[in-house]
Amino acid sequence: MMLYICSSWKKNKKQLELKTRLFLTKMNKKTIAMLGAGSWGTAVAIHLAKIGHKTLLWGHNPQHVALMAEQHSNPAYLPGIPFPENLIPSDDLIECVQSADYVIIAVPSHAFAEIINKIPKPTQGLAWLTKGVDPASHQLLSQLVASRFGVDFPIAVISGPSFAKEVARFLPTALTLASNNTNYQKKMHQLFHHDNIRVYLSDDLIGVQLCGAVKNILAIACGISDGLGYGANAKAALITRGLAEMTRLGLSMGARQDTFLGLAGVGDLVLTCTDDQSRNRRFGLLLGREVPIPEAEHQIGQVVEGKHNAAQICAIANKNKVEMPICEQINALLHGIVHAQQAVSNLMSRPAKEE
């Protein structure tokens, strides 16, 4: 009799523990507003929805949003990957923000200022996946948010080596999450972290943001080099010296050197410069093959952040008296001042210096 009672008690205890875990899991699920329905915003929205969060995916084009709702996928930017049932497309920006526990921006850098000026102040804080700087003011995106919502407003930037299709397909990925507020950072970490995504924490907002902006320009450079047929040696040199440029700029602005050796720095740089899933690299490949810039952009079909950010990064470097010869040559090429082979020649003929 006692054996039966003990066995029954253990069984009931296990059932109670399971019910408690399920209840706590349900309680921890949140409503997320993902502002930006391009490939990256959609991929992260799919990830968040798959792990149980109700996810509102905002897009600026009503026809695009209607198509996503009808097909339960994003055929324009992430075809072939179905939406979970709890991922809801929307074209109502304000309603998305007001309905959400957490707001994440995933629009291109040139649209970032417009979005934060339209939305009401989020209750918890603001996170973004956008990689770049503001083209009008040459400011980091964190500076724009501070101007809009205050310097003490909790923010987070999520960056690192990550392609949209792989995240949407639940393939293993590691990211860096930088924030100015440890409590908000902890909440965002809990929101994202899962078996397929490992999130590392940082407080170096400047470094993480610069890494995300500069690596796109360097990916264009590597694409051009490969398009010209210059081989692996040249690409390795561009990545290595590009990392040096990125680090110099960051240190001049108060970033930490270890950030540039981490996921947001060398991790994202190597991925973007070497894999053809990178639209910046593919854009560079086309330029190296003498495809005109407008036609190259048309063939890519999505925003090429490196093209939009080259002038801004060079302006920031000039302001901080930092030499960035690779970025400067890419900027000159994008403005029609030099052609691809001349840009390489200009880099190779620079005066000798210590590494």
Q: Which role does the model predict for each range below?
A:
Residues 111, 148-154, 172-220, 224-259:
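Internal alpha-helical scaffold of NAD(P)-dependent oxidoreductase catalytic cores
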Residues 215, 222-226, 251-261, 269-355:
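NAD(P)-dependent Rossmann-like dehydrogenase/reductase catalytic/cofactor-binding core
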Residues 27-81:
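NAD(P)+-binding Rossmann beta1-loop-alpha1 motif at the extreme N-terminus of oxidoreductases
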